[in-house]
Amino acid sequence: MDTWHDALGGEKQQPYFQEILNAVRQERLSGQIIYPPAADVFNAFRLTAFDRVKAVILGQDPYHGAGQAHGLAFSVRQGIRIPPSLLNIYKELETDIEGFSIPAHGCLTAWAEQGVLLLNTVLTVRAGQAHSHALLGWERFTDTVIRQLAAHRKHLVFMLWGGYAQQKRKLIDSQNHLILTAPHPSPLSAYRGFFGCRHFSQANSYLSRHGIDPINWKL
């Protein structure tokens, strides 16, 4: 199994998946603003090929402010103000990775292109309404993504931040992969143990031990 088509082709034919796409399409047609734009919903898969995934960072649902979401968890487009959770991720990187300096932008495309799958468990959201698409069925699809990676790839790093992401731990075989958990990087919880978790250096140590090129976290 080498491609997303191999891993997810059957899933995308399932009635529930077609129903999700139809529901989102109907909302857009009715004039509801949905983020990210239709062309960006599956960006994480476009930028990070199945056979090149090294690490998975799990988010919840997309940013719901104008111009922010572009299909990569935690990331925003160039020119958009860095959201608080991402700024905390940068602060942790600054103390964890030698030579990392906080960039002036929040675009994580460079990570995605190196094999960091920035996966939201829900792939769309209504403008201004967090979790508004939580019940559409996206999680059935993204759970399959996690399962397929865990089953058909070896030595991946899964970063699960916050209780919601950590519920996905049960989908991953810890014998074959590294599972790193910490509180969410949001300002509400980062001080409870996200700061100091050193997930980024731990990920690179694990990858190197298994003969896999480490990730250049610098942006």
Swiss-Prot record:
It comes from the Bacteria. Its EC number is 3.2.2.27. GO terms for molecular function: uracil DNA N-glycosylase activity. SMART domains: UDG, UreE_C. Pfam families: UDG. The keyword S-adenosyl-L-methionine does not apply. The active site is at D61. It is found in: Cytoplasm. Its main location: cytoplasm. Keywords: Cytoplasm, DNA damage, DNA repair, Hydrolase. It catalyses: Hydrolyzes single-stranded DNA or mismatched double-stranded DNA and polynucleotides, releasing free uracil. GO terms for biological process: base-excision repair, AP site formation via deaminated base removal. Gene3D superfamilies: Uracil-DNA glycosylase-like domain. GO terms for cellular component: cytoplasm. Excises uracil residues from the DNA which can arise as a result of misincorporation of dUMP residues by DNA polymerase or due to deamination of cytosine. Belongs to the uracil-DNA glycosylase (UDG) superfamily. UNG family. HAMAP family: UDG (MF_00148). This is Uracil-DNA glycosylase. It comes from Neisseria meningitidis serogroup C (strain 053442).
